[in-house]
Amino acid sequence: TPLGVIKEGLMQGGDVAGIMAENGYSYSQMLLANIGGSAGEASAIALLVGFVYLLVRKVIKPWITLSVLGTVAVVSLIFSLIDPAQYTGPLFNLLSGGMILGACFMATDYVTSPMSTKGGIVFGVGIGFITLMIRYFGAYPEGMSFAILIMNSTVPLLNRWFHQKKYGRA
């Protein structure tokens, strides 16, 4: 996968731009899934169409997904501005690995996500941040599944901190 290739290349002393050019990776290929990868690295366009369908049908709310993707974009931008040779930028991080699949479909699971909007935003920010920390500093090139599992353990606490106010009497 592109994440694994980048990670290996960086460990061997390469830089992000050189590794991408050497392996023929482009953002358009990543967007259309015209590149080797795992099952979760399907076409970003197809995944986003499915996400929009679920939003229109009011099956899910966008807050968790937007907070995951927004956090990944902002944090990876900061890191790539600090050292662009060692840290991949926002577009690469948003299009690679299982980022879109995880943010749109796995993180928004009813059973394991917070009930309130504020809790969902904190949940999404945590997922995005942990994912990037694993990608940048961990031994494993992908971090989405681990980040979701870690943040799932915080859901009871988030539900307690950001509980919905009840109106009226029962």
Short names for language-model regions:
Residues 1-48:
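Long hydrophobic alpha-helical segments that form multi-pass transmembrane helix bundles
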Residues 32-40, 57-61, 91, 111-120:
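Short, amphipathic, aromatic/basic-enriched membrane-interface segments that mark the entry/exit
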Residues 45-48, 66-74, 93-107, 121-129:
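Hydrophobic alpha-helical segments embedded in the membrane of multi-pass proteins
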Residues 47-87:
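Membrane-helix boundary elements
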Residues 79-84, 130-142:
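Hydrophobic alpha-helical transmembrane segments in multi-pass integral membrane proteins
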Residues 83, 106-115:
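Alpha-helical transmembrane segments
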Residues 90-99, 120, 138-151:
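Loop-to-transmembrane alpha-helix initiation sites
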Residues 136-170:
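Cytosolic-side transmembrane-helix boundaries in multi-pass membrane proteins
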